[in-house]
């Protein structure tokens, strides 16, 4: 070893010891002929002092981020020079020898200053030397270990599934890899291990998990990555409660890493209730401000805007004092989300209603509105009217925006809930409008994925009443973030074929794309279910990071590019020829 001690491990009790440290020069300071450096390694920082002789002369050439090894004696710092802000603040190392292991070029940015994301990603190896990013990756390693420990106690088997497979419709676009030995044919990188883990249940493995890399070729969305990580689990002979119980044990172990005792069992809310109360299937429960249904209240209204399939409201406490410019800003905020605007009523201090909507209401509506929505004098009532899904989504977003503007969200709080009783299907046009890929050519597509089992009461009727069919599915939400989703799976060929048919995937297409799974179901497939956790998102939450990029070693930028390596990049003509990427498919009979 090139060092005897970790820089962050030294304490006053080590005074008098000869030590060898190795790391990077975080800072260098010249004080009256004496040079001090902060020597940083993965464990922390120790102050090193160069006082005289050849070692002092050698220290003059040190610059930020030189990689060095230092020998010296641990000394207690003189009284008054201690630094209580760091664990090693009571000592310094009096250097007797200095070796430069690697010089550093001038830095593209100072590691102790804020830098732009593009620069940080381009020089990610420097960025990770900083305390925050480096700490986040080390936390991620602990997260992996904690989950593995829980799963080992429950006899789960860690199994790696293929990362080169065939392209199957799963809800997003595939990344494709040309097969050189079969020109014109392609592998696909998996969007998830879904099909393989179900096959492992058919294979009798019973309890499987994997920290899996997944790939989805999606359009640009903020804070998404084309490659990401899931903790993927599957269990045989279980129901939803069994999967949820193991999942909660994992979450409890993870949050214990940051000193939080997560009380279990976690609360549950139905999908319908979440949409009605919060306007989203990912409700942030750290604050109130629930949506209020107003359709019946305005049943006889003469105001044409409120003669809509859905009318709802959310109250902004104290919002009546907002200046006109701010209220106009809310309209622009709504338009950026695809709405025409955000109607509002202001409740005066005397209880009278003001604003452009109030004059269109009847006396009875004005008299009863504040009580109906729970508004007090001085509040602002925001409304949305129109199709239920989009209107609730607008109010749900307004609810979050109100909470942020009024500082109603406790940043130290943790609020979890399971969302259950999901619809099995949604209209394909709604999925497409939301930016998802509607699998199949039918009018209906799966809300989660095509392999989600219907709840028992919906199994016989989901193809005649798709709008009313419920899925045996469950998502886990933390602070308004979906951090995992799972379901009981279909394990019978006939049921799976009926689901495919509902989605417009007819028999021949199903056999071509999913025949291996359908065939497996004919060999005594067990009932099974599982869940996949968004590992990047969970780690970001634990690390108190706003972006998942902060907890990925070498992330892509928001547009899917890698500033560090320059990927994606063109390939050479020779690579194109060898890969067969330009090969034309053979016609029938050729």
UniProtKB/Swiss-Prot annotation:
Region annotation (Aspartate) ranges: 194-197
EC id: 6.1.1.23
Location(s) in or outside the cell: Cytoplasm
Record-level GO BP terms: aspartyl-tRNA aminoacylation
Residue stretches in coiled coil: none
Residue stretches of biased makeup (Basic and acidic residues): 575-590
Region (Disordered) residue spans: 557-590
Residues annotated as binding ATP: 216-218, 225, 482, 534-537
Ligand binding (L-aspartate): 170, 216, 448, 489
GO molecular function: aspartate-tRNA ligase activity; aspartate-tRNA(Asn) ligase activity; ATP binding; nucleic acid binding
Gene3D superfamilies: Bira Bifunctional Protein, Domain 2, GAD-like domain, Nucleic acid-binding proteins
Listed GO CC annotations: cytoplasm
PANTHER family attached to this UniProt entry: ASPARTATE--TRNA LIGASE, MITOCHONDRIAL, ASPARTYL/LYSYL-TRNA SYNTHETASE
NCBIfam families associated with the record: aspS_bact, PRK00476.1
Function noted in UniProt: Aspartyl-tRNA synthetase with relaxed tRNA specificity since it is able to aspartylate not only its cognate tRNA(Asp) but also tRNA(Asn). Reaction proceeds in two steps: L-aspartate is first activated by ATP to form Asp-AMP and then transferred to the acceptor end of tRNA(Asp/Asn).
Stated name of the protein: Aspartate--tRNA(Asp/Asn) ligase
Organism: Mycobacterium sp. (strain KMS)
Lineage of source species: Bacteria, Bacillati, Actinomycetota, Actinomycetes, Mycobacteriales
Gene name, Swiss-Prot/TrEMBL: aspS
